[in-house]
Amino acid sequence: VPADKRIIVGITGASGVIYGVRCLQMLREIEGVETHAVISPAAFLTAQTEIDMTSQELRALPDVLHSFRDIGASIASGSFRTEGMLVAPCSVKTLSGIANCYADQLLVRAADVCLKERRRLVLMLRETPLHAGHIALMSTVTQAGAIIMPPVPAFYSRPASLDEMVSHTVGRALDLFDIDTGAVKRWKDAQAD
């Protein structure tokens, strides 16, 4: 049975690898969603450092894992239909590659395809503080059609744990693809508590 939706998840080596991991975990629980992932070599190191996840465990999360260097992969072509791509976390290096159309590896190429095909591209940029160069890159990709969504937690939901905070933030990112994970405590619901 073909999936109703395909979504690409890119995971870079920036701090915050849990966002990409949680995204793949959440999407695995939703029927009809097929995940395609491209993971940078640095992301495997970050996963080991930040969340004690082995490369084997990380590789097992998506439905389809594409090689970081495979520019000929299905997701490198506009004819391969997807809902779009979430890059979580997104490093400044990756942001720069996307902003400058410098697609020397699959993660940036897949993002570039989303932009040229006018598909959703959400970048969870993990950098702070920002200088003018970072802001210029964010402006460039936004003008090209991307959405910059830094993983800023919502406190109105009164998260009881870091896990809840991460799930809520990833749920908000997936809202942008019209995928409801059930993890987002909506504003009016939070006010009722």
Question: Predicted segments — roles?
Answer:
Residues 1-122, 126-193:
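A cross-family phosphate/adenosyl-ligand binding-site feature
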